[in-house]
Amino acid sequence: MIGLADCNNFYCSCERVFRPDLTGKPVVVLSNNDGCVIARSEEAKALGYKMGDPFYQVKEKMEAEGVAIFSSNYTLYGSLSNRVMSMLSHYSPRIDQYSIDESFFEADESMAKVFFREHAEDHPTLFNKMTIDELSEKPDSLLHRYGSKISADVLRAVGIPISVGIAETKTLAKIGSKFAKKYKGFQGCCLIDTDERRHKALSLFPIEDVWGIGRQIARKLDYMGIRTAAQFADKKESWVRSHFNITTLRTWKELNGESCISIEELPQKKSICTSRSFADEGITDKNVIEEAVANFAVRCTEKLRRQGSVCQGITVFAWTSRFNEHVPEYTIHDSLTLPIATNAQEEIVGAALSILRAKYPKPMADSRPDRSDMSFHFKKAGVILWQISPDHPRQQDLFDPIDRSKQKKLMEAIDAINRKNGYGTIRQAIQGTDCRFDLKREYMSKQFTTNIHDILKVKTR
């Protein structure tokens, strides 16, 4: 069996962890530069706010209705996500993190039985005076309680509510988690372990919400009169093969209980990107753009080292807004290949800056007398690392002028200090100190778990 743990309204739940006064109140989280709504609590959904609502259009309404508004705090969200995933690893030996707020895990009765035997003395109320063997004889008791226990423990330990779905396939597990989230009667876990339960769940589930069914496929199925997952699952395999591709066929098989997507370890990324859109009118100062690109390159190298990889390809891009008719348009997009694969930030930052400087536009003079010096307003920039390979073993070069052993120790020391004291404690001079390219985040919460200056203070008597 496969389980899926899905954090409920994750970004909003993260903001509530350190703000218990927001429990039961509407909460929304905004996108980069406070552009639009990207997360809503159940209370905010009930007030009619939609995903993607432009903030400037709903700001006054939110303030009038007492909605708690937050800018995106990805440092906090990432930290709490790591805590949730760490908790899940105590319940299953195989974890497959799908996103920041979702993770698949291996789940079966033997695993649940072992867990409960080890913790029976600590949790006697879980069994209601029944033995574990007696629970195992009931068709759903053990696995359902196992999933409910995971949900309750994560909420108690981390403060994040999660919904658990357990089924024979990943697709069915995702459907189960949706039901667990929607209906409180499931007590945090929906178990789909029989054909009867599977068909009942599929008959209530819209086809457009099935994992793996995109908008175009959903429209095609709707045109064919198929509006629920059950109607699609009941079709013959030959019919599915004749109308759809192999990906949709795999989804059909998963809906019918045939596992086609197994639990896997998190695969190594084929490319790593860090980018950002800039607030207001954008950036016109070349020095600020260089600071931004340097910081993006450093972020990429941190991710690279974290997954134990090196890279040989680097791409830098930056562009102006296409929608501002009063300033000139310009696009930077270029790449280079390093002679030796590396994950050292001084090498990658240097290469990224060389790309930017080579392609940066020269000062231009406009022909109009009222605009003798027009500048470029860059609205977005980023760095991409590619040709990624494992750090061990790494291809060596007989004539490499760099002491790689010494360089590796330096990177390990920098990473350790920055992990302990916060991002940017040790940085290259080109990164700057005041983050002149930072996002517009007027509703930013504190970094309660990663910045020692933001740790909550508790008064004792």
Where are these regions (language model features)?
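Gly/Gly-Pro- and Ser/Thr-rich, intrinsically disordered tail segments characteristic of DNA damage-repair
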Residues: M1-N256, I263, R404-R461
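A generic structural signal for short beta-strands and their flanking turns/coil linkers
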Residues: T23-K25, I160, Q312, Y330-D334, ...
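Short Gly/Ser/Thr- and Asp/Glu-enriched loop/turn motifs at secondary-structure junctions
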Residues: Y98-E102, A167-K170, S309-G313, F376-K380
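Core structural elements
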Residues: S103, V310-N324, A381-P393
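Short, charged/polar, Gly/Pro-enriched secondary-structure boundary elements
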Residues: M111-F116, E325, S389-Q396
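Short intrinsically disordered coil segments
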Residues: A120-T125, T331-D334, D397-D403
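DNA-contacting surface of Y-family translesion DNA polymerases
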Residues: D209, I217-S375
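Acidic, metal-coordinating catalytic segment for phosphate/diphosphate chemistry
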Residues: T337-R461
